[in-house]
A protein has these predicted regions:
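C-terminal peripheral helix-coil segments that are non-catalytic and often amphipathic
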Residues: 1-12, 144-157, 172, 178-205
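Helix-turn-helix
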Residues: 28, 32, 36-70, 74
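Amphipathic alpha-helical interaction segments
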Residues: 28, 99-107, 164-172, 190, ...
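Hydrophobic alpha-helical connector segments
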Residues: 74, 85-114
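Amphipathic alpha-helical packing segments from all-alpha helical-bundle domains
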Residues: 81-84, 130-156, 162-167, 190-193
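Amphipathic alpha-helical segments used for helix-helix packing
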Residues: 100-103, 109-134, 148, 178
Length: 205
């Protein structure tokens, strides 16, 4: 929204100023989208519903995002980017590979389960196969490659077995969302450590 020389803001105003909300409009849209996409479903959620949940008019929403796809893409990338950045750091360290693999698993589970909404469930949406989400898929592939590299360092597996164990470990980590959803009151840190222990057993490390 623009500001006149006299200090008056011009442009489309927010439909509702939600009391106690200090986030910027884009963050509020992402929060609203996360809730609606995971509770109602992506296809069943309209841009109008997202805007209203964020406390603004639908037309105002387009000042901040291009639409539902942009919101979904950013939400998906938020589940991968922190773990990918950490994986790159761990790959560069000289600690035992087994310890680094355990730490990546633990941290990744905390990212996936630490949020208020089950964003990992969005991975299964058919829309994610579209070109708009290529960046997310590339980041996810790079993260999986980091897992493979650490499993390879921590074990002496042949390529075929290495690929299988990597698939199983990666599947365990991404699948924990469903387990966590069945008991959301379980402490995430405890759950993350237990999952990392299980991942090492699966890898044979």
């Amino acid at each position: 929204m623009a500001t006149t020389p006299g200090g008056r803001r011009v442009g489309r105003p927010r439909a509702v100023e939600r009391a106690g909300r200090g986030a910027d409009p884009r963050s509020e849209l992402l929060t609203a989208a996360a809730e609606l996409f995971t509770v109602k479903g992506y296809a069943a959620t309209s841009t109008r519903a997202v805007a209203e949940r964020a406390g603004m008019r639908q037309a105002t929403m387009y000042h901040y995002v291009s639409g539902k796809e942009e919101l979904l893409a950013e939400l998906l990338e938020s589940t991968v980017s922190p773990s990918l950045a950490y994986a790159r750091t761990l790959l560069a360290k000289e600690q035992p590979a087994r310890d680094r693999l355990w730490e990546l698993c633990r941290a990744d589970v905390e990212v996936l389960c630490g949020g208020e909404h089950n964003l990992g469930g969005l991975y299964l949406l058919p829309e994610v196969r579209g070109e708009r989400f290529a960046g997310f898929r590339e980041s996810r592939d790079e993260l999986k490659a980091a897992y493979r590299a650490l499993v390879a360092e921590a074990t002496s597996l042949a390529d075929g077995e290495l690929d299988l164990r990597t698939d199983l470990v990666f599947g365990l980590i991404e699948g924990v969302i469903l387990v966590h959803r069945s008991d959301p009151d379980r402490p995430v840190s405890e759950f993350a450590r237990a999952t990392a222990d299980a991942a090492l057993r699966i890898a044979g490390a």
